[in-house]
Amino acid sequence: ILFFYLVMTGPQVSSLRALLMFFIRMGAEITGRDVDQPTSLAVTAAILSIYQPLYLLDAAFLLSFGAILGILLLYPIFEQKTRLKAWEGFKISLAVNGMLLGIMLYYYFEVPPYALVLNVILIPLFPFVMLTGIGGILFSELSGTVGKIGFRSCDRLLSFYDKLCELTSALPGSRIVTGQPELWWVLIYYGVLLFLCFLFHAMKNKTDNRRKQAGFSLLVCIVIAGSICGCGILNNDSKNLQVTVLDVGQGDCIFIRDREGKKMLVDGGSSDLSSVGTYRIEPFLLSQGVRKLEYVFVTHGDADHINGIQELLQNQKQGVKIDALVLPPEEYMDEKLLHLAEIAKENRTRVLTIYAGEKAGTYVKCIAPLTKRKNERIRGKEEEMPRLEAGNEASVVLELKDGAFQMLLTGDLEGRGEEQLVESGALES
């Protein structure tokens, strides 16, 4: 079954690891030798690393081998005889997630705490998913009715998986976003964890004390919980201004975190990268420990400035929450911006408009475009301002000031919009 599963899904790291360990186990049994899981795991890792050295930096490789390592090293610390199989499953889940914590935070920047319970419920059901799916394939050739029963059973089980995951993701605290820790933090975490494992196994050979085992279990749990909290604090305690210009190809996206801790995004889109919000902007925000953006500014309605923001708005339940979407003045809105505003409202995000002279927080001020709304005067002149066309020349211009540091965020400002900004005198202040 494992071989055919590998053929069907392709040579994924986890499948290759399972297949190689299975062959080593079978070889040991055929030759009459004892099966040594740590040796089997090490040999498999060596074979795959020789085949593809870059696997050592691959998240899938590290997660697959880390899960088995957690069962081999950490689970014995929690292992105590009990009649409750569910409790045993929880301890295995805790051991696996504890070993994978550093990898999860480094590559995915967050921890799903309810996964401890979900694994206890869902993993035991996986053999039934496999059996009903394979049964549906085999029996569909003999009897269409029997095949449909197998497929429907498999579909119901997978639907149960989806519903349960959706339910837990909607619960408070379903995601702990910590940001990406430094590599030294990951090394220290695994150093402490492996030291505790070594100490436990060394003492276990000398004495079998349940109190000591319980103490080690508690200590490991404290290390895991403390590491999550510590990583989150390290990524959110900076009091300095942070400005990051993201590489989104042909497009624009700028992230700002001011001294007060407010997080803002100015534009977010690309014309040559697909799903830029999902695969470029959101992962960056999570890597910085950003759970919520106070403001998302849109300078104008071109696709290479807004399509990523649209993805962020629609994925707030699973991604980064947006408090307020800030758009150009109403007289400069086009159909794309109005559509974006509707998406924001549908996803319970406030929609604001910003005008020249208004501030967002302490450090960000809008200086363009000028509008009739406030009857701005151009250097004291009373003549009516020229009408700008919605789009590039009416781009929102933001001024970022922090002490001696100044930065202009101009969108795609051009033509009469540039002339108006220069004549307004806003650049002289």
Place the predicted regions along the sequence by residue.
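Alpha-helical transmembrane segments of multi-pass integral membrane proteins
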Residues: 69-174
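Generic secondary-structure signature for well-ordered alpha-helical cores
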Residues: 9, 28-33, 52, 126, ...
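A generic short alpha-helical patch detector that favors 3-5-residue windows
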Residues: 38-39, 94, 126-127, 273, ...
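Non-globular, low-confidence helical/coil segments that flank catalytic cores
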Residues: 81, 86, 138-429
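A generic alpha-helix surface/boundary motif
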Residues: 22, 115, 133, 278-279, ...
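Generic alpha-helical secondary structure signal
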Residues: 22, 41-45, 130, 163, ...
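Hydrophobic alpha-helix-in-membranes signature
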Residues: 52, 101, 123-126, 327-328, ...
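Hydrophobic alpha-helical transmembrane segments in multi-pass membrane proteins
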Residues: 1-116, 181-236, 419
